[in-house]
From Swiss-Prot:
Any single GO CC term annotated in Swiss-Prot or TrEMBL for this entry: plasma membrane
Biological role: Could be involved in insertion of integral membrane proteins into the membrane.
Pfam family name, one: YidD
Keyword terms of this UniProt record: Cell inner membrane, Cell membrane, Membrane
Chief location of this protein within or outside the cell: membrane
Membrane topology value: Peripheral membrane protein
UniProt subcellular location: Cell inner membrane
Superkingdom, taxonomy of origin: Bacteria
SMART domains documented for this protein: Haemolytic
Protein family (similarity comment): Belongs to the UPF0161 family.
This protein's record includes keyword Membrane: yes
Name of the protein: Putative membrane protein insertion efficiency factor
Recorded coiled-coil stretches: none
Length: 74
């Protein structure tokens, strides 16, 4: 249930806030897409940790690149 609420919040951000901002993510997939996939694939706790780690790396001094969400261990 928490996972679904967090994914919902990310989707709201993607549809309402993100279109108003210039593209700034240095990674593919974008940080918000990464967060939604991580939450769906790994659940609220681990997915949030993966998303937070990704957001901390998304800055002008990091080269960026392709960074897929790790597969679930289940």
């Amino acid at each position: 249930m928490i996972r679904r609420a967090l994914v919902f919040l990310v989707r709201v951000y993607q549809r309402l806030v993100s279109p108003l901002l210039p593209p700034a993510c240095r990674f593919y997939p974008s940080c918000s897409a990464y967060a939604a996939t991580a939450l769906e694939r790994h659940g609220a706790l681990k997915g949030s940790a993966l998303a937070a780690r990704r957001l901390l790396r998304c800055h002008p001094f990091h080269p960026g690149g392709i960074d897929p969400v790790p597969e679930s261990e289940r």
